[in-house]
Amino acid sequence: MDARAPNKQTFKMKIKVVSDLHLEFSDVNIQNNENCDVLILSGDIMTAEDLHDHPETSYSMYSNVNLDNLGRRQAVALRFRDFLKRVSFQFPHVVYVAGNHEFYHGRWDASLTHLREECSKFPNVYFLERNMKVIDDVIFVGGTLWTDMNKEDSLTMFNIRSIMNDFRVIKKDNDNWSNLKPVDTVVRHRQTLDYIRLIVDDNKDKKCVVVGHHSPSFLSAHEMYKDDTLMNGAYHSSLEEFIMDRPQIKLW
């Protein structure tokens, strides 16, 4: 991505984007062989509840740990923390947003708190959820950005609630641990998009990078699934006009 520095000298910011690593299943070694300035982790990297249930006080991520002596979820939590440590060393800046799987088996907003706390341990790892980070005069803004469920279509929400695991294994932050509902994610979609709009519209003279987990266009749907209108509503939103109206958005 090209960006312009305050001294008017042109420079190029190199950004590497990865997502859906699902480290709960196996480790992935991300290298910075391209000498990128920023690594974007755009969701489905780890599960926050494993981090919460197994704090690093029970072991040190800076010492050699025999994974065979750890329980499965404790080993997974160690893997998550070691991954963040490695990418923080490999890349000058790391921008991370949660995907839907980050919330699995935990509470919705509490999971965000757990992830934010873990990222804050590293000075160059920034967790975004309706907030922003300026890197070399480029604005990074975003969050999970759930979809609008086919523009808040009731049939889409009814069907997806019974099909997707999200609405069985993610709990809301209330006393009775009720399941997350599609209408909840639609409200969060609106809130996140409103925040992105606010930041981007207030910075028309800047270069903006929007970071989210879910796709901003149905054009991203694989050819195999392009006619699955209801299910696609859980993965994509039609934000093409939003993007085209804002030329300061250089990357999404």
Labelled PLM ranges:
Residues 2-96, 103-110, 175-179:
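N-terminal active-site segment of His-dependent metallophosphoesterases
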Residues 17-19, 39-44, 95-100, 126-130, ...:
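Active-site neighborhood of phospho(di)ester-bond hydrolases with catalytic His/Asp-centered motifs
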Residues 86-93, 121-125, 195-207, 241-251:
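A structural motif corresponding to the C-terminal end of an alpha-helix
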Residues 26-34, 82-88, 127-136, 192-206:
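Short amphipathic alpha-helices and their capping/turn segments at secondary-structure boundaries
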